[in-house]
């Protein structure tokens, strides 16, 4: 085995261990934020939505800067610094009794993610061969699902005693993750050349096809982020107990562990990436529309199952498509910018979703936020279809001219 192949194999295992620590640290804390501050402390959902949206927008919206800096200086210092900053954010969240302090803790957490998320994504693109990326992204998603359940179970158990224990556990896990990276991560360069920060950012911004694709995905993320805000609140309201939230993540884990990899393997042989992304988005949109009309936990979990199945179909295709469109000369910048759709969609999804949720309750129209999200998903589906049809038409035109 060549040294390059050996490095790739070792890199796969490193990425999987690192991902598990990050997922556990995140899901111990974040699914319980809405339960803690909305249901236990009586805050308006929009106040918590602002906090979650701020974290999302800072982490993903500034991702291009984190990625560009990592292109210049390498992945290791950015990842270690970012994880320590995330740990500080979680520690601050544990003592938050005013909205401004919760917002500040989410700001710290988001800035940490800005530093470590783009270089971690770029390492996947660097270490995993193109023909293997779809399957590897599926493995990461399976791991995400298992980690989400374990994290949510642990967080729910700790929440019975004290929310500060929840946040302290998340902080400790991110400190461990920082130490793991500081000790074992080699000083790898992310790109084929050491690209200056401004040049990497400029290269991305001139790629109109990539920019349009990323911005359109904002609508997809408006739906996806509700697993952190409105779906846990809805499960808690219907069940009457916050402990039921862990079953929502258990459903995701069961579906992911049993279906994700087989669906990815089968669909990559029979369908294009864009068709898989659009099919998953359509299922997510249609399953979200009736959520506000259900009154039983069984009906709600059935719709959540459909939503997760749509995500299982769409997410590996979305990740693989984003990676395939990235320029190897500026991987960090591309993977950082690819998070901008999540920044915009996440911020609007959290803040707008929280506001619509409160509005729906006040006017006795609980289905309002869910119907709006479903409509947004349908429009995003149509916009992606138009983009992909334009791309195919341009390709056919070039082939005919040649």
From Swiss-Prot:
Pfam families: MFS_1. Keywords: Antibiotic resistance, Cell inner membrane, Cell membrane, Membrane, Transmembrane, Transmembrane helix, Transport. Residues 34-98, 160-164, 235-243, 298-299, 361-367 are periplasmic. InterPro entries: MFS (IPR011701), MFS_dom (IPR020846), MFS_trans_sf (IPR036259), MFS_Transporters (IPR050171), Multidrug-R_MdtH (IPR022855). It is a multi-pass membrane protein. Belongs to the major facilitator superfamily. DHA1 family. MdtH (TC 2.A.1.2.21) subfamily. This is Multidrug resistance protein MdtH. The lineage of its organism: Bacteria, Pseudomonadati, Pseudomonadota, Gammaproteobacteria, Enterobacterales. The gene is mdtH.
């Amino acid at each position: 085995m060549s040294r390059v192949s050996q490095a790739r194999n070792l890199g796969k295992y490193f990425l999987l261990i690192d991902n598990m620590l990050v997922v556990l640290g995140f899901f111990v804390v974040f699914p319980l934020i809405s339960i803690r501050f909305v249901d236990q402390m009586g805050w308006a959902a929009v106040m918590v939505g602002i906090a979650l949206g701020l974290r999302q927008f800072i982490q993903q919206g500034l991702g291009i800067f984190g990625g560009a800096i990592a292109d210049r200086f390498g992945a290791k210092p950015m990842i270690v610094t970012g994880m320590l900053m995330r740990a500080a954010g979680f520690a601050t969240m544990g003592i938050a009794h005013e909205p401004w302090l919760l917002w500040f803790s989410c700001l710290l957490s988001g800035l940490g993610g800005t530093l470590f998320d783009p270089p971690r994504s770029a390492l996947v693109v660097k270490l995993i061969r193109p023909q293997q990326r779809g399957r590897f992204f599926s493995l990461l998603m399976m791991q995400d699902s298992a980690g989400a359940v374990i994290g949510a179970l642990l967080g729910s158990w700790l929440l019975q005693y004290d929310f500060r224990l929840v946040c302290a556990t998340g902080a400790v896990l991110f400190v461990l993750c920082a130490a793991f990276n500081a000790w074992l991560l080699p000083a790898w360069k992310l790109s084929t050349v050491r690209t200056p920060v401004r040049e990497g950012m400029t290269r991305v911004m001139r790629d109109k096809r990539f920019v349009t694709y990323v911005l359109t995905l904002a609508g997809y993320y408006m739906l996806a982020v509700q697993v952190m805000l409105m779906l846990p609140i809805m499960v808690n309201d219907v069940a009457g107990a916050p402990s039921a939230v862990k079953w929502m993540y258990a459903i995701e884990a069961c579906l992911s562990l049993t279906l994700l990899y087989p669906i990815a393997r089968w669909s990559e042989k029979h369908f294009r990436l864009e068709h898989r992304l659009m099919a998953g988005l359509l299922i997510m949109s249609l399953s979200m529309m009736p959520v506000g009309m259900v009154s039983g936990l069984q009906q709600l979990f059935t719709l959540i199952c459909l939503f997760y199945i749509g995500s299982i179909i769409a997410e590996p295709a979305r990740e693989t498509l984003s990676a395939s469109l990235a320029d190897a000369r500026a991987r960090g910048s591309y993977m950082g910018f690819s998070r901008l759709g999540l920044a915009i969609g996440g911020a609007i999804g959290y803040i707008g979703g929280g506001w619509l949720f409160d509005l729906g309750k006040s006017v006795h129209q609980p289905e309002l936020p869910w119907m709006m999200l479903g409509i947004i998903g349908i429009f995003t589906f149509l916009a992606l279809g138009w983009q992909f049809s334009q791309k195919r038409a341009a390709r056919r035109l070039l082939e005919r001219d040649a």
